[in-house]
Regions:
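N-terminal glycine-rich FAD/FM-binding segment characteristic of electron-transfer flavoproteins
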Residues: 1-303
Length: 303
């Protein structure tokens, strides 16, 4: 039986649960924050552990708590979203469990009882299939990789587990610098490339994203130029997204970038170069000065 445990202590990853439900031939188990059991059940979890915790605090202490929980449940495949905090916690668990861990996967499949984990390698020049030889197989999955799909209705087994952090170590606050929804959850993304040309240009794109109720994205070259922070990067070395609408502004359309937004519903490209590869991928294209187009959209009252 391929029983899979998905660790989502900081928020349900609907896409990852959907994929795990399809992979599992046994019961899909999930650890989720208090109050999110119903959502986890909708996306395939049959046995749900709601985490009651006033705060998580020190990650090493929380990892020790999760370690005992995993051992008690006995799952042989453990998955988690590759968020900032789970990227720290999963290696601690893998070391204690003497398990193989593949980080930042972009695809998963089963061959018998073996989990095949796919991730970019050698500077994103190829995709590597990885098999873990350990008894417990572990992987983190890039957020937004899998499209959320609701599963057949079922009545889940829900249990509450309580975590009390060491009172000697307290997390005073945990803030997010992100504007709007995280990219992996955004339904509308306005993304810019090197063609935008400056931080000031990206401020205009961010204003448009806010007007549309979306989030700001960027190509790797724009991030490396210092126009926007890494959290905005879409692509093989950034975040994989699947919004309903993706507006690509001044983005040429490199393969690495396209791989990160291939799950988008509709793609609108704005570029002054009519031969830009992004137009081959877009549903709608506008050839012209991006700033003039964006200025008109910002002035449009009916958006």
């Amino acid at each position: 039986m391929k029983e899979i445990l998905v660790l989502c202590p900081f928020g349900v990853d609907k896409g990852l649960l959907s994929k795990a439900a399809r992979l599992s031939s046994g019961e899909l188990r999930a650890l989720v924050p208090a109050g999110e059991a119903e959502t986890a059940a909708e996306y395939g979890a049959g046995r749900i552990f709601e985490l009651s915790a006033p705060e998580i605090g020190d990650e090493s202490a929380f990892a020790a708590f999760l370690l005992e929980t995993i051992r008690r449940w006995g799952s042989r495949i453990v998955l988690a979203p590759a968020t900032v905090r789970m990227r720290n916690i999963m290696p601690m668990l893998a070391w204690q469990l003497d398990a193989g861990l593949t980080a930042d996967c972009t695809a998963l499949r089963m061959e018998g009882e073996q989990l095949i984990q796919t991730r970019p390698a050698f500077g994103n020049s190829l995709m590597a299939d990885i098999r873990s030889l350990s008894e417990i197989q572990m992987a983190t999955v890039r957020p937004g990789t899998f499209r959320p799909e609701k599963q057949a209705a079922k009545t889940p087994d829900v249990q509450t587990i309580t975590y009390t952090p060491d009172e000697r170590v307290k997390l005073r606050s945990f803030g997010s610098f992100a504007q709007g929804k995280p990219l992996s959850q955004a339904e509308i993304i306005v993304a810019g490339g090197m063609g935008v040309g400056s931080k000031a240009g990206f401020e205009k794109l961010e204003a448009l994203a806010k007007k549309l109720g979306g989030s700001l994205g960027a190509s790797r070259t724009a991030v490396e130029a210092g126009f926007v922070p890494y959290r905005c990067q879409v692509g093989m070395t950034g975040i994989t997204v699947c919004p309903k609408l993706y507006i690509a502004v001044g983005i040429s359309g490199a393969v690495q970038h396209l791989a990160g937004m291939s799950g988008s519903g509709k793609v609108v490209a704005i570029n002054s170069d009519p031969k830009a590869p992004i137009f081959d991928y877009a549903d709608y294209g506008i050839v012209g000065d991006w700033e003039a187009v964006v200025d008109k959209l910002l002035k449009e009252e009916n958006l």
